[in-house]
Design a protein with these regions (language model features):
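Flanking scaffold residues of small Cys/His-coordinated metal-binding clusters
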Residues: 12
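Bacterial N-terminal signal peptides that target proteins for export
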Residues: 1-9
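Lipid interaction determinants
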Residues: 20-116, 122-251, 256, 260-265, ...
Length: 330
């Protein structure tokens, strides 16, 4: 995507807490149905997103219906010869949340859609961004996605701003047809015992730039940031990131990074540009004892995407993404 991305290498208070869920939830992605005649598979994108009274990702969801989360599976097809978009199939379910599950209560209310799709240009803040636009049978736009990368899509509002998730779910869908979910290496575990020291006070002469939350799959970068060793049965990591800036100048100041049993503090800096995107801004969180910072890509003012050590976007699974969503400033 040729948009202006900003790389966040963490400035903050990043609360990362391991959480548990039934091991049966880590299921392989189903094989997509055969492609329509003359078409080939473009990609399968899956995820679980938020849903609220203020945000209805699909118009089929009644305003008076209790909707707290949604499951998504979007299958995109393209012309076998030209690679141009052809048709899609969308499967979703919505409803209230249910404790210790990643599905709407009772399986939720299903939504199934088919139709045509195309690629158009521009979000509200980036005129060069690629947008995947799916149409209903009446030729009205059913839903639009920002193409974050070949493997990541993000649900858009009708004004083409990115939908903002919450501490539990983002609005990012992950490509699943070109990767195999990592199997759990043991029973689901809550992780290290929560023996974290008292939380220190906010740094003096600083203000909060933003607070971001989300739940991510377990990954070596997150383990390193937490300063803990990988442990068997890790299914997801809950993350909370607070960015601090100098109160007078607005320049990056200090960060505090809290894990289940650890707290990190330090400084962060800004670098301009990255490979393939000279307009990107790189924020670096220095980790004591680590040669490399922890990296996040800023898609807009409200979303951060975790990057690997090669500064490539990490791709989640059908349950969790590597996206942090802005919550209220604190």
């Amino acid at each position: 995507m040729k948009s202006r991305f900003h790389l966040f290498l963490g400035a903050a208070m990043l609360l990362v807490v391991t959480a548990c869920a039934p091991a049966s939830l880590q299921t392989p992605t189903t094989i997509p149905p055969p492609s329509p005649a003359g078409s080939s598979l473009r990609g399968v994108f899956e995820g679980i997103t938020a849903c609220s009274a203020q945000t209805r990702p699909l118009s089929q969801i009644p305003e008076d219906t209790d909707c707290e989360l949604m499951t998504w599976k979007v299958i995109l097809y393209q012309d076998s010869g030209t690679g141009m978009p052809t048709t899609y199939a969308l499967e979703s379910a919505y409803g209230a949340s249910e404790a210790n599950t990643t599905s709407p209560a009772g399986g939720g209310t299903p939504i199934a859609m088919e139709g045509n799709w195309e690629i158009v240009k521009g979000t509200k803040t980036d005129p060069e961004a690629d947008v995947y636009q799916l149409y209903a049978t009446d030729s009205q736009v059913a839903v639009s996605f920002l193409k974050v990368s070949e493997d990541l899509l993000h649900v858009l509002n009708s004004d083409r701003t990115l939908m903002i998730g919450n501490a539990a779910w983002s609005y990012t869908l992950n490509r699943t047809d070109n990767r195999t979910p990592a199997p759990l290496d043991g029973p689901v575990s809550p992780g290290p015992e929560a023996t974290r020291p008292p939380i220190p006070a906010a740094p003096p002469d600083s203000s909060v730039l933003g607070v971001f939350e989300g739940r991510m799959p377990c990954h070596e970068v997150a383990y390193e940031a937490l300063d803990i060793a990988p442990f068997p049965g890790c299914l997801k990591l809950k993350s909370r990131l607070t960015l601090y800036v100098d109160q007078a100048t607005g320049a990056p100041s200090s960060y505090m990074y809290m894990g289940t049993s650890t707290i990190r503090v330090g400084t962060w800096t800004i670098l301009d540009g990255m490979e393939g995107d000279p307009d990107a801004v790189v924020y670096q969180l220095e980790l004591e004892g680590s040669k490399e910072p922890v990296s996040f890509l800023k898609a807009d003012e409200n979303h951060l995407f975790l990057l690997d050590r090669d500064l490539k976007l990490l791709v989640g699974n059908a349950l969790f993404s590597y996206t942090l969503s802005r919550i209220e400033k604190q």
